[in-house]
Amino acid sequence: MSSKVSRDTLYEAVREVLHGNQRKRRKFLETVELQISLKNYDPQKDKRFSGTVRLKSTPRPKFSVCVLGDQQHCDEAKAVDIPHMDIEALKKLNKNKKLVKKLAKKYDAFLASESLIKQIPRILGPGLNKAGKFPSLLTHNENMVAKVDEVKSTIKFQMKKVLCLAVAVGHVKMTDDELVYNIHLAVNFLVSLLKKNWQNVRALYIKSTMGKPQRLY
């Protein structure tokens, strides 16, 4: 870990988040979030950063991905039970804003075949883009299952108008080591995006959905 967050602090916080959680069993799988508060940053003037980083362990097991595919990709998706739609199914939505919005809500992310990806704005309008879910490209030399896993384990940092961010870095069924490693990757990547690195970080916390925040920095 970078010198600013000691290994002990990190493990202690992770243990508190994971095992503090065992006192109360929830009916759902709680996500663990990394919450970041920034300083010396002017969202109006300074460049708003965004970046994605792939974590080692999938932070959100329930994260759903839909393939918008050509015939070959749809057949592949069907064989491995991955949700998919072909161009005809997309055309049936008829650019209806409500239906496109519903589609964007139904899945967390999309992958699209090369032949389809360029046509998506024309077929669906701007709906997926507005929802921040424009599909990533899926080529025929990529393994579909591996690509879906990659999308599931990738998190995005995006600076908006406010000085705090939160991203999912794991869930409460992970081991201490898995969660520590994910947080380590996420924090180092985030700090590398900041103009003045650690000088822009006011505070870092981790917390489970229903748990108390634990301060890392």
UniProtKB/Swiss-Prot annotation:
Domain of life: Eukaryota
Pfam families found in the cross-reference section: Ribosomal_L1
Stretch forming the signal peptide: none
Cross-link Glycyl lysine isopeptide (Lys-Gly) (interchain with G-Cter in SUMO2) mapped to chain: 118, 161
Residues with the N-acetylserine modification: 2
UniProtKB keywords: Acetylation, Cytoplasm, Isopeptide bond, Phosphoprotein, Ribonucleoprotein, Ribosomal protein, Ubl conjugation
InterPro entries given in the database record: eL8/uL1-like, Ribosomal_uL1, Ribosomal_uL1-like, Ribosomal_uL1/biogenesis, Ribosomal_uL1_3-a/b-sand, Ribosomal_uL1_CS
GO biological process: cytoplasmic translation; response to ethanol; translation
Cross-referenced PROSITE patterns: RIBOSOMAL_L1
Cellular component, GO, one term: nucleus
Crosslink site: Glycyl lysine isopeptide (Lys-Gly) (interchain with G-Cter in SUMO1): 118
Modified residue annotations for N6-acetyllysine: 91, 106, 118
Subcellular location(s) per record: Cytoplasm
Key word Acetylation present: yes
GO molecular function: RNA binding; structural constituent of ribosome
Residues found modified as Phosphotyrosine: 11
Record's subunit section: Component of the large ribosomal subunit.
Family, as annotated: Belongs to the universal ribosomal protein uL1 family.
Function field: Component of the large ribosomal subunit. The ribosome is a large ribonucleoprotein complex responsible for the synthesis of proteins in the cell.
Protein name as annotated: Large ribosomal subunit protein uL1
Organism: Homo sapiens
Gene it is expressed from: RPL10A
